[in-house]
Amino acid sequence: MSTFTAYLDDQDLIRIQKGEEHILPFYLKTNQGHLALIPVKTSSAATDTGDYFLSPIPLELGEEYTIYDATGNSSILHYRNIVRKPIFDQTFTYSGEDLGSFYTPRQTQFKFWAPISQDVSLHIEDQVYPMNRTENGGWEVLLKGDWEGAAYHYEFRVNGLERRIHDPYALSSLANSGDSLVIDRKKITRPIRRATRQLDPTEAIIYEMSVRDFSVQKEAGFKHPGKFKGLTESPQLNSEVLGFDYLQKLGITHVQLLPVYDFGSVDEEDQWKAYNWGYDPVQYNVPEGSYASDPNDPYARILELQDTIDTYHRANLSVIMDVVYNHVYQADEYAFEQIVPGYFYRYNAEGERTNGTFCGNDVASERSMVRQYIKQSLKQWVSLYGFDGFRFDLMGILDIQTMTEIAEELREIYPNIYLYGEGWKMDTGLSEDQLAHQYNAKRLPAFGFFSDNFRDTIKRTLVAGHRRESQHSANDFANILTANVGKLGPAHFTQPQQAIQYVECHDNATVFDYFQLEKEEIRLEDRKALSRLALHLVLLAQGVPFIHAGQEFYRTKGLEDNTYNLPDSLNQLDWTSLPKCQEEIAFLEELIAYRKSQPLLRLKKGQEIRDYCDVKWLSDHHLIYTIEKDREKITILVNIGDQEQTYQHPSDSQLLFAYPHANLQVPIPKGKELSIPAHSWLLLHETKSAK
């Protein structure tokens, strides 16, 4: 029985954690049976389990070793800190993109990266095939015959323990992250039909929604509730069009889907037992089975997602995928943790996993095989499914080099791809200058960032009913309306496409609920007016507007702040609200159409904003926001207070928007006094005569 445990912490450093009894010296035995004495370099007896540090000659990484003491007690030499040393990546970076299973009717090739494993075998359809070690930690086996649809997994020994995992490079699996399935890639490879008009990022209007929330409401009458197929349905309710046709009518340009990869916590064979948004990744390259018609069919989840995206493309709607490469679900059980313990995550100086994500683990994107895995995964989602962009959850956890390479390699596949994410600064064990957070935006010109400055300023100021921030601060209305590019405050972003302007998303309370939570005695009409104003400002600001599904018809989640695992009754889109909100929706459709037709509302360059935009407070309760270029001028008057405000317009103009009226084209003569209702805004347009 072993009285100590041995760890390989560097190529020439073994650490012995000894038990109550130990007898020197120590010996190292290779799996070929060779025995060598290892001298003690230093020892520590500060505790009852003091350590010995041994200095063997540099070991051949990947082999299995055993350490003995003088009485024959032994311990497998565990690969520990060595897996996070540069020598490990230098030795075991596998550069090929052929990991996984590759099928033809005559044979299927299986390749698996497991650099410190022994006795690796493929288990397929109740048969076992030993795999052969190749270069850089790879293993492979070639099976003759037709294996299409076959279920398989890998078994191996690592650090003395037997392991069994699915294939982390697989494209399909049995339900609930079960065995991987052999796929004929020819059956899932198709021409990608993109939206006809390719847009600049500032022309995008993003609409965030969940596959499940979109179609689960019983009263709405979807035939495939909670499924990929439900995303393309257009039922009617009281003659009002719902679903897919509603999205087209609204006029948005992009939909952002909450996670659609295989995630944990929802039973794919009985999805109604539990609800989850899906921010708990299990298989990054496999679509979520609970959204498929049959989670055990090798092709259903793949083809149904492909068909959905193609349908959106045919309707000139682009599709963005919400991806979560910053942490995994159940870190100890995750495939790469089973393959190379301690490699896939970041650790602090005490040898504990960092937890910047607050999910128990932070993915170490800077490590060679992790970086390669993330890039390959993203490229498959673009080339096989046709995704038009990615929203990176907790992007500030990921490193700049990885994100830069992602942008470069994805643009080689699809030049117009749009990339953005949550750029929060988080403590994750890497220096801040290495991380892809919003304060490093200048080094990440290819990425957009959710603007918490915009979100918080709009919501808090509207609750207060008066100006809150000092002039030229990062959170002043003047700065956030101009995309924080430095016109009227600190330059947070370099270009407007980096500013994702939003006040509501799946996280936190909806705006409609927020105003109730902040002002318990608020009247319903004021709650609605503030919610409308917040949404409209998203579309009037420079940058990229982002709308949470249902926000336009006062989405509520029962005043809950975090509904990631709460019932469908709270998370579902309430389509029955549509008939009651026709005035609001019709106005929003007109505002969206106007933004799409008016280049001044979506300037493409930071310098243009600095040259053409201005924002001034007329009082503590209302402001004027102007965009003037050449002979054209837009004037937007915003009243954040609960009392009517007035403004005397200095030139001849046309009043275009005054809620609930749009496209008014009402002449406004010079000097006319305008009334701006509480919690509302006006938009005027003028074209100056040529000199």
Q: How should each PLM-predicted stretch be described?
A:
Residues 543, 547-560, 570-634, 643:
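Glycan-recognition and catalytic regions of carbohydrate-active enzymes
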Residues 112, 154, 209, 257, ...:
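Conserved, mostly hydrophobic/aromatic
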Residues 149-150, 668-691:
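C-terminal beta-strand-rich structural cap/linker in extracellular carbohydrate-active enzymes
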